[in-house]
Amino acid sequence: MKIKINDYTKGEVIKIIREWTGLTQQDFGKSIGKSKPSIQAYELDKINYGIETLLKIAKKHNLTITIEKNK
């Protein structure tokens, strides 16, 4: 599956990835060293996460992050 993250909020991106994994917020959080409240806050766009967190998620859940220049 593939998404264009420019079409989503940061929170929606985290939620989509978590749903792909089939994990609860608590289990997803544990998988990346974050708490359930942190994952909830990410998904609701209440707190920001950095590229380090996104890279950690990608590595842990076998995802590829691609940046492509628009034509």
Question: Language-model features: where?
Answer:
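Short basic helix-loop element that most often maps to the first helix and adjoining turn
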Residues: 12-27, 31, 56
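Residue-level recognition of specific faces of alpha-helices
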Residues: 13, 38-41, 53
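Recognition helix of helix-turn-helix/homeodomain-like DNA-binding domains
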Residues: 33-47
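N-terminal flexible/basic segments that precede or flank functional cores
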Residues: 1-8, 62-64
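DNA major-groove recognition helix of helix-turn-helix/homeodomain DNA-binding modules
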Residues: 50-67
